[in-house]
């Protein structure tokens, strides 16, 4: 069944099950490729003989390159459309991941990695633009489930990488097989991505303003939350809670699984609760999880706290993207570009900010600060929904 939306800019686009599945695959592929590259980092560190601080600075600079390039993604969508940008971006990411597996020089590796992350930024913007439009035209909630497919891609890639590596396959062969999977999925689903372009006369890039900049700031806080669990949960469990080093990764693993499950259930959950309750309630639940992690010392109670964090924050970012379809101040792709760019400041600057807090005060203060930011996020979100009159 095809569902048509009578909109002046979208009247020639129809959405059915093929377009919805293609949008899900558009999220799966970048997650799949990123989790192909991530396990290579220790191998690359050893092969290029990099010290930890050099590797850290390299990764920070690469992250900044994505942030700089991301605002140009709207222009790419305007000129070429969502379909071409997603297909080209996912293809280049897969091919570059193979290149990253075999480069022997730090400078060539840095250039290739910078290009990889820049392409990832453009793909991120275009896939979210495609998803927002698909949800708008379909007339039902879809974004939480689509974001779940990013996580599914990460899990699938990491699992396949581990199986192949344990069987003795070298990293270049593994990356090549992963690349082939990406290209095969693009061949099947890529043609059903939306060929949406920004209408003539509308700017592809605009300085974020009004409700869009507020949503971008909220997205920044939400990305910072995910980064805090990823970067600092292991340190908290081992150094503050005095747990065995073997348990260092349990917090992030529990958080990731809880987030994935809730995102798979997220569209129906948000539809039942409403967007406002899902965001504000999710922020409060997540803040409670961070507070409990600080005060509880039992392994199982800490696991419960990380479950709360994963469940609470799972649907916040998808709802922020979904809200962009209600605003009238900017074209959808420009609004998505703005929110994504501002959100990624939490990924890029968050680890450094939290590191200063951990060094200047203590590690527990990192989680206390994030809990406070989440309470502030809930208050600002209330203002956003009032402005949108929802």
Model-derived segments and their meaning:
Residues 39-53, 231-247:
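Short amphipathic helix-loop junctions that connect adjacent transmembrane helices
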Residues 49, 81, 102-107, 242, ...:
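Helix-breaking motifs and short loop linkers at transmembrane-helix boundaries and internal kinks
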Residues 69-81, 165, 262-274, 358-359:
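Helix-to-loop junctions at the C-terminal end of transmembrane segments
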Residues 91-104, 285-297:
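C-terminal ends and interior cores of transmembrane alpha-helices
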Residues 121-136, 315-328:
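Intracellular juxtamembrane helix-capping segments at the cytosolic ends
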Residues 172-190, 367-383:
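Symmetry-related core transmembrane helices of the 12-TM Major Facilitator Superfamily/SLC fold
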């Amino acid at each position: 069944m095809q569902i048509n939306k009578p909109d002046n800019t979208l009247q020639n686009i129809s959405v059915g099950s093929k377009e919805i599945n293609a949008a899900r695959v558009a999220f799966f592929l970048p997650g799949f490729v990123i989790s192909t590259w991530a396990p290579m980092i220790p191998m690359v560190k050893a092969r290029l003989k990099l010290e930890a601080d050099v590797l850290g600075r390299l990764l920070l600079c690469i992250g900044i390159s994505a942030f700089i390039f991301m605002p140009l993604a709207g222009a790419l969508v305007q000129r070429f459309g969502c379909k071409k940008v997603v297909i080209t971006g996912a293809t280049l990411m897969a091919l570059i991941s193979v290149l990253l597996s075999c480069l022997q020089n730090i400078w060539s590796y840095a250039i290739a990695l910078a290009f990889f992350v820049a392409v990832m930024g453009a793909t991120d913007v275009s896939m979210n633009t495609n998803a927002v439009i698909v949800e708008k035209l379909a007339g039902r909630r879809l974004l939480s489930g689509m974001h779940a497919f990013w996580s599914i891609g990460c899990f699938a890639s990491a699992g396949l990488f581990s199986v192949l590596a344990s069987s003795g396959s070298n990293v270049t062969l593994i990356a090549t097989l992963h690349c082939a999977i990406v290209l095969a999925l693009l061949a099947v689903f890529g043609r059903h991505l939306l060929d949406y372009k920004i209408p003539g006369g509308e700017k592809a890039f605009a300085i974020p303003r009004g409700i869009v900049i507020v949503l971008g700031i909220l997205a920044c806080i939400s990305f910072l939350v995910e980064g805090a669990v990823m970067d600092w949960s292991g340190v908290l469990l081992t150094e503050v809670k005095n747990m065995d080093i073997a348990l260092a990764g349990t917090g992030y693993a529990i958080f990731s699984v809880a987030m994935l499950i809730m995102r798979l259930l997220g569209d129906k959950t948000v539809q039942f609760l409403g967007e406002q309750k899902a965001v504000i309630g999710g922020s409060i639940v997540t803040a409670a999880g961070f507070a409990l992690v600080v005060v509880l010392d039992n392994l199982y109670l800490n696991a419960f706290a990380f479950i709360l964090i994963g469940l609470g924050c799972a649907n916040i970012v998808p709802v922020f993207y979904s809200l962009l379809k209600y605003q009238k101040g900017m074209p959808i792709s420009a609004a998505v570009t703005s929110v994504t760019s501002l959100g990624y400041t939490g990924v890029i600057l968050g680890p450094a900010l939290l590191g200063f807090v951990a060094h200047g005060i203590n590690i527990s203060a990192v989680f206390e600060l994030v809990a406070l930011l989440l309470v502030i996020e809930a208050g600002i979100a209330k203002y956003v929904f009032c402005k949108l009159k929802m």
